[in-house]
């Protein structure tokens, strides 16, 4: 098996570079085959080298490239395009274009990541606006695809239509669903509900039913029920829904832990249920679903949460490695026709 080389933006995210380099170590130790993965790490020497000295395993499997600049969390995309060409994010993305790496992962500024990726890599044929896409678990022991998760806050009906096409292709390529059920996220299932843009997108998808299995609207309350394979939303709604779902998982865990420690009886019950609850919570643990692919780009770009710790970042790295190894982009291009 050939070696997969992944570019890593070591300076992106709230806890960089510690969470990034620590995440690479966790990925190498627990999630990946060390023998066929290497990393090109882009960042500031003064901050990254001490981390590499701390994590010897990462140092052995990586090449460090010193980059003088950083894309800041409050940088506007236009500013990043003009002024951040020497940043760790830019150089990491550019390594894909130059054929040095097969994918990139970053916890940095989402808008800047999208803008730089579009500028440097370009988009796939007939795709105007890439979207952030990931696979999430449902209660039915199956996964579903949701997009957009924050790349495009304000979308036209045609953009939502393209997201549906890309999500459909992603579900076929990644989840191996032969005929994905696609739905638009809305406040109700009736055709009259929603904004003008949502209703227009509904009509576009209804007209394309010969090429896409469109199932109409889906409400957030039914999103995790396993009824559909692809959920389409604008970046604002998609991002809000994702973060609410993640917070509910953490709240449920916290409430359960408090409940089982309230008395002797509940503590005993908690011990009896501990392994089962832990196993079930892990299915919905947001950390293991960190890492969303920017679909529609001419290259594998994976966005990690800005507040990701090392475990969460490690799972984003796994997403990038698997996407590159399985040549996901080629499969999506094939599905797009």
Curated annotation (Swiss-Prot):
Signal peptide: none
GO cellular component: cytoplasm
Record key words, sorted: Cytoplasm, Lipid biosynthesis, Lipid metabolism, Phospholipid biosynthesis, Phospholipid metabolism, Transferase
Main location (coarse class): cytoplasm
GO process terms (BP): fatty acid biosynthetic process; phospholipid biosynthetic process
Catalytic activity as recorded in UniProt: a fatty acyl-[ACP] + phosphate = an acyl phosphate + holo-[ACP]
GO MF assignments: phosphate:acyl-[acyl carrier protein] acyltransferase activity
Pathway note: Lipid metabolism; phospholipid metabolism
Gene3D superfamilies: Isopropylmalate Dehydrogenase
EC number of the protein: 2.3.1.274
Compartments where found: Cytoplasm
SUPFAM superfamilies: Isocitrate/Isopropylmalate dehydrogenase-like (SSF53659)
Record note on quaternary structure: Homodimer. Probably interacts with PlsY.
HAMAP family reported in the protein's UniProt record: PlsX (MF_00019)
Family label: Belongs to the PlsX family.
Record function comment: Catalyzes the reversible formation of acyl-phosphate (acyl-PO(4)) from acyl-[acyl-carrier-protein] (acyl-ACP). This enzyme utilizes acyl-ACP as fatty acyl donor, but not acyl-CoA.
Name assigned to this protein: Phosphate acyltransferase
Provenance organism: Ehrlichia canis (strain Jake)
């Amino acid at each position: 098996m050939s070696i997969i080389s992944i570019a890593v933006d070591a300076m992106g995210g709230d806890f960089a570079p510690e969470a990034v380099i620590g995440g690479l170590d966790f990925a190498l130790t627990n999630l990946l085959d060390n023998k066929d993965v290497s990393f090109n790490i882009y960042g500031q020497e003064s901050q990254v080298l001490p981390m590499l000295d701390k994590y010897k395993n990462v140092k052995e499997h990586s090449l460090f490239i010193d980059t003088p600049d950083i894309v800041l969390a409050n940088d506007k995309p236009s500013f990043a395009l003009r002024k951040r060409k020497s940043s760790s994010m830019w150089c990491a993305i550019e390594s894909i274009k130059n054929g040095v790496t097969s994918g990139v992962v970053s916890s940095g500024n989402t808008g800047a990541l999208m803008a730089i990726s579009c500028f440097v890599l370009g988009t796939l044929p007939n795709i105007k606006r890439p979207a952030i896409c990931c696979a999430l678990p449902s209660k039915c022991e199956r996964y579903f695809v949701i997009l957009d998760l924050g790349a495009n806050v304000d979308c036209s009906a045609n953009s939502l239509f393209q997201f549906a096409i890309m999500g459909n292709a992603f579900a076929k390529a990644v989840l191996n669903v032969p005929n994905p059920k696609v739905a638009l996220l809305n406040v109700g299932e009736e055709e009259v509900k929603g904004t003008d843009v949502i209703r227009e997108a509904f009509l576009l998808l209804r007209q394309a039913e010969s090429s896409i299995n469109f199932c109409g609207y889906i409400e957030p309350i039914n999103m995790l029920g396993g009824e559909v394979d692809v959920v389409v939303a604008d970046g604002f709604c998609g991002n809000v829904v994702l973060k609410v779902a993640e917070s509910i998982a953490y709240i449920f865990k916290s409430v359960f832990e408090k409940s089982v420690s309230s008395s002797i009886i509940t503590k005993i019950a908690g011990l009896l249920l501990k392994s089962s609850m832990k196993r079930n919570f892990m299915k919905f643990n947001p950390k293991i679903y960190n890492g969303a692919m920017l679909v529609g780009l001419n290259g594998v770009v994976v966005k990690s949460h800005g507040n990701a710790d090392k475990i969460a970042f490690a799972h984003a790295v796994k997403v990038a490695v698997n996407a590159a190894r399985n040549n996901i982009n080629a499969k999506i291009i094939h599905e797009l026709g």
